[in-house]
Amino acid sequence: MEDKLQTTIDKILRLCAQNPDFDSELRKKLNIVTSNETLLIGDERINQIYEYCLERVVRKQAEDFYSGFPMQELVNVLVDDYCRMEFFRRKDAFGDFCLALYQQIECVTNNLCSNPDLDYIAKRMWGCPAYVITAKDTPISIENRRYESAYSIASLVLYKNNIIEKSMSSLQSLSATEKVRTVVYYLGYKATMRNVDYESYKEITSLLTDIYQCRNMNHRGSKQTEWEEKAINRIFPQKAVYYHKFLGALTLFIEQIKEGWSSLGDIKRYAEKITPKT
């Protein structure tokens, strides 16, 4: 290389060292990135690869979670919502996590409550005693109910206001939380709930209600009800715990549906034999 050219290069290098703006502009003209920029691009790319790998793992987990789910037409939507739920959990976006989780519960519940068989069963059985007999010599059966008890299925599952009108209406007209409680009773407990099952029923339905109350906590413009505000104020300070509690509630709910689905036929046959009570 000629000495003049080498001298010019040396001058340019000195200018770059002395003047950061000149250095930056020269790099732009030559399409050269700094080592710091290279590092940032590298980190961003690594994060993208990491997130992609995580998404693949989570999608496989979601597909396994919904493996064997009886309503196959819902599985693709449920898997997508599950993946969104886990994405928001990684980002510690609790409100969005609750919404994505609740959308899975809502999808399943609304589908079941539009099922003519479940609607028929509920209308005929609302007036039946809520619990079956658990005597020593009596087998646990949907037919062996505590008929001396005035505590009906409707009294257990539905909220107290307008309970008679609700029991005569379709399941689709119930409130969101009443629909969930209905599904848990008829599929989760296969309409064969014992007195000793009350606490577990209360625990799962309370958690599912908490998820419902927290689902809109991040939505702008949506005014929280008094019940939603109380639930959020109770839950949010302990959100690290409730991530796990809510995931546990979703797991139990879905497992109950998987197990209870095959019992719908037997429950319907029992409902056909009885005289509906109000």
Indicate residue ranges for each PLM-predicted region.
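Intrinsic-disorder-associated interaction segments
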Residues: 2-5, 15, 19, 23, ...
